[in-house]
UniProtKB/Swiss-Prot annotation:
This is 2,3,4,5-tetrahydropyridine-2,6-dicarboxylate N-succinyltransferase. PROSITE patterns: HEXAPEP_TRANSFERASES. Its main location: cytoplasm. Belongs to the transferase hexapeptide repeat family. It catalyses: (S)-2,3,4,5-tetrahydrodipicolinate + succinyl-CoA + H2O = (S)-2-succinylamino-6-oxoheptanedioate + CoA. Pathway: Amino-acid biosynthesis; L-lysine biosynthesis via DAP pathway; LL-2,6-diaminopimelate from (S)-tetrahydrodipicolinate (succinylase route): step 1/3. GO terms for molecular function: 2,3,4,5-tetrahydropyridine-2,6-dicarboxylate N-succinyltransferase activity. It comes from Rhizobium meliloti (strain 1021) (Ensifer meliloti). GO terms for cellular component: cytoplasm.
Amino acid sequence: MTNHDLASLSQTIETAFEGRDAVNTGTRGAVRDAVETALNLLDSGKVRVAERSEDGTWTVNQWLKKAVLLSFRLNPMELVRGGPGEAVWWDKVASKFDGWSVNEFEKAGFRAVPNCVVRRSAYIAPNAVLMPSFVNLGAYVGEGTMVDTWATVGSCAQIGKNVHLSGGVGIGGVLEPMQAGPTIIEDNCFIGARSEVVEGCIVREGSVLGMGVFIGKSTKIVDRATGEVMYGEVPPYSVVVAGSMASGSTMANGQPAPNLYCAVIVKRVDEKTRSKTGINELLRD
């Protein structure tokens, strides 16, 4: 699809979204065709909700988020088959694997372990491995990435190449508010078990999050070496663990107020060190 075609497609979706109150399951023609085309492009990885430029800036293609939202208005609730014991579900979004045969799986080139769930319009790159996990619509999972057991990749989240999302990790989804960017995990990151990255935060390339690290937009991310406090973004090649900071306030009874949770950057490493050092060794203080 040419840039001109994409521009025309995005304009159709933008216009439809402005008049979304008139879009429903009975809508036919250009609007439905445009949304279906956008979802197919997302599903195949030919377009992404967010794209990284050479300088590290991420640009969000809001029109693709709007296409996903419009699809909820266009598609009726229906039975979704394939559950254990011939059980069914009730939803508006089909499985990515609906109608797939051996040919489609071989062409896609990733591994989908039984009981993983991937919704249509999510893209899974070759050599990725999906353990029993959940990947929501509009998400992007890069080449060679492991999505471990009970991990969740939220709507429109962007996961880079050679990332490891450990067991029970939650990567938040962002469809609304419309102006919000998706949660992003860049290439070669390791996210420890039961950690959560949400609310459009970014974990930059090569970073390691230890087990049980929680990062949202309001979470303080503290560099232990410099004392710098940042929000919403983990710098490249950072090693991060869960910690706490003194609140600096006093309770009514005169006692110091409880410490508050923060994420602590315990060290920063270069690309060479990151590639040669085991995760457990990096996390040791």
